[in-house]
Amino acid sequence: MNTLRLVSLVCLMPWSLAPVMLAGLLAGSVLPCLAAESAELAVRQPARESRIVLDLSKRQITLVRGEQRLGAWPVAIGDPKTPTPKGEFAILNKKVNPIYVTHKSGQRRELRGPSSPIGDRYMAFHRNGRGEFGIHGTAWPHWVQIRAAVSLGCVRMLNSHIRQLFDAVDVETRLEIRS
């Protein structure tokens, strides 16, 4: 995909060079660029069709592309006092090795990596007066394995599972959270 993206950028740049582009078009040398640009769109198209479905009652998150279910993983969700929000959302941003800030023990500490409370992958999906909600890894796999309702509203996944989901979706991927 990176190669296709580079080729496409090269193909788009010559538009500012109209005489060269016209000569290339007449000579037929532009066709490979057009084919590469189409190939990139074909490769990227399925990602736009992807959506994430979180079923709170099953405590399961599923990646769907078109009508095909690509993966399903157990999750821990928000505690009843701080529930995971329901509704239609989209992935707002994606972070590798996000920083988790804690003030426990009276001092500010920054934690990151798979042993931090949010693991080594984080995808934000909603912001409101309570803060930001995300799908992330965890340092406590037990809560995910028993599909507990223990978080402050975020969705916790096993670190290996969030990495799979993280790599399969883009920012703006749709997220449906339902009961």
Spans of features found by a protein language model:
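Mature exported/compartmentalized surface modules and terminal targeting/interaction regions
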Residues: 2-11, 31
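Cell wall/extracellular polymer interaction/catalysis modules
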Residues: 31-104, 112-126
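N-terminal hydrophobic or amphipathic segments with adjacent small-residue motifs
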Residues: 18, 61, 72, 81, ...
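Exported/periplasmic cell-wall-interacting domains
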Residues: 2, 6, 47, 99, ...
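Bacterial N-terminal signal peptides
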Residues: 10-29
